């Protein structure tokens, strides 16, 4: 962010000479010195000095200058009506934006108009639809560091646009990163003791008032919102949640009660262990929410193929269920039963879908209502949504699944609120309240009387044209009205002789004169007075209606949650029915999948080959070999995705599946480096591997792909073997390990709870043909040269590779080979010594870290 966004030093020195308006501007820039202040001047938001230069550059608007008695200021401005895209550009550039609106009517004030910051827009607290960019949650998070070594971290998350609020305590920085990867907040507010730079890659990081993180202040704020000091039992959670609430209030501008988020009444305290845990690496590798691989999935993520939801509420709920799959068997079974019932009743499911399409995003509507920013169309959308609720409840009337029964009971259509809105708000209200015509006739007698007066006056004016034509004999006489001169009678200059004496000239045109009469002026005053009073009364009535609706915010949020769950379950059922998914059996001693398929790849590639999987307590570690492109990575991801789907409550793409509940899914799949962090592919791989080996349990699912390939072959093989043995002997996790180290297949044969699987291929005249079918046993060939040829490597290179592959003996100086140099012989001698030492190492007794240390020591002795 620019170092100075307020007045330059020279200007600050002579601030007493500033005009009142510029003094007001600079006072706001001092108060909101961490933001760009958009300062309303008439129909524009304007910025001055360094802030203007910054905004002009980012928003690509013209930089001009404002001149007054104190000098010239650089100035940039954007129209208020089209400000949102410019605000979005400033947010994307890393700025907060403080919006300072005029809070007085300029026509009613002598002197400078008062202005106040009405909202501070930040990446994590935007609520405008134009800035949110979709139905997904937009979280702001707060992170509080523990006051001592054992306190850990407190993490709180809030979606200001919906009211979703979560809090948890996390033991260390790694767990913090896992949760940030799971929720992907747009903004992270950090407290004292937290190194903001360490989380700069996770979100837009914002430092905030240290006092907001103080336990006493945080405890008071949490109790004020959520009704008790024991809602969050640990100090770390309290500090994070209290500071987050304070920050959310700060972004609302104003002061006191005007800042309060009245619709926020519930915080969900959770432990990560209550759900299937997946860190950011696993979420990316499995492509749950964003597609990042290049194996033909056409940019499609898992959430995309599952999303048959009818409304925004359902889309967010489905995303949340994938983000946080269940680990409680009863809860999983409840979702499966509900999905099964909807699969079996396609007519009801389709009717549900049709009704749910008429459901608006009432979570965000309730948020706008409670913040006093909802317009008449928002209230009409609420009423229309509440009208759908009885229809949805009726379709669930005969449901047997207990999940559907509980959702049916939660579907409250709030008859008093719906009735109020139907009586009060017209069916198709205008966008702006100032346009009038928002409140129905018959709702308020006073408004009806004013409208009657207005209509009668306008009817008199309409009749006036006919009567004056008859009176004057001028057929071309017209009665009109404009915003400057009001009502008038227009007579062409050719008919000036027919103008009566009581006409009073109001305006002269080139070919006509415009007049008024005393009676027309009197009627005009009556009409204008009635219009203004009606407009004021209509606004007053609307605000009262909006406040009454806001009082029911908690009930409407409960309805929103129920509708969201129904929509997500119906989406799961629609996908299951359309694509032949099966209800998994949860329990047993492992993962048994018959005819499993990858739900994304089968939809984006033709000829997908289903595969079976059997892993249990007797066969927990599968070593998978086979050529590149044969399907190893897809197969491993497929198994993990099926587990995730099952625990999210969805049916799975398979002929049959019996699955144990897993606590975590870990992945080390694909090569990646961290250029910005200065970490090589191998270092990133080892860091991810270390995290897996520390955190995995015997209830976890682990996917490993090509461990150790970022270093020398001997080192990589040793690491891969050590990891395999450690997982088998010490961790006990269900593991799929794809490798090109064929030496690992001997370990799989040797280890009692391991097995070999392979993907076969056949050579032909046109190259290698992949079967994409998993088979028992180890692969007998890697087909690397054939894959290179298939990929288009030039034929001379492929031919030379075959020669080298077929003649390995030449490297030893045999017939036809070159004689080894003295250096080469010396290296062989050193290598022989290292090999001898390796033979003496008891790999089974080493921890992974000890194994890495041994390798590091040996590697350091190799020139």
Swiss-Prot record:
Highest taxon above the source species: Archaea
GO BP of this protein: mismatch repair
Record bears the keyword RNA-binding: no
UniProt entry keywords in alphabetical sequence: ATP-binding, DNA damage, DNA repair, DNA-binding, Nucleotide-binding
Gene Ontology molecular functions: ATP binding; ATP-dependent DNA damage sensor activity; damaged DNA binding; double-stranded DNA binding; mismatched DNA binding
SMART domains xrefs: MUTSac, MUTSd
Coiled-coil regions, chain positions: none
ATP-binding in keyword set: yes
Record: residues binding ATP: 626-633
Function: This protein is involved in the repair of mismatches in DNA. It is possible that it carries out the mismatch recognition step. This protein has a weak ATPase activity.
NCBIfam families: mutS1 (TIGR01070), PRK05399.1 (NF003810)
Family according to the record: Belongs to the DNA mismatch repair MutS family.
Protein name: DNA mismatch repair protein MutS 2
Organism from which the protein derives: Halobacterium salinarum (strain ATCC 700922 / JCM 11081 / NRC-1)
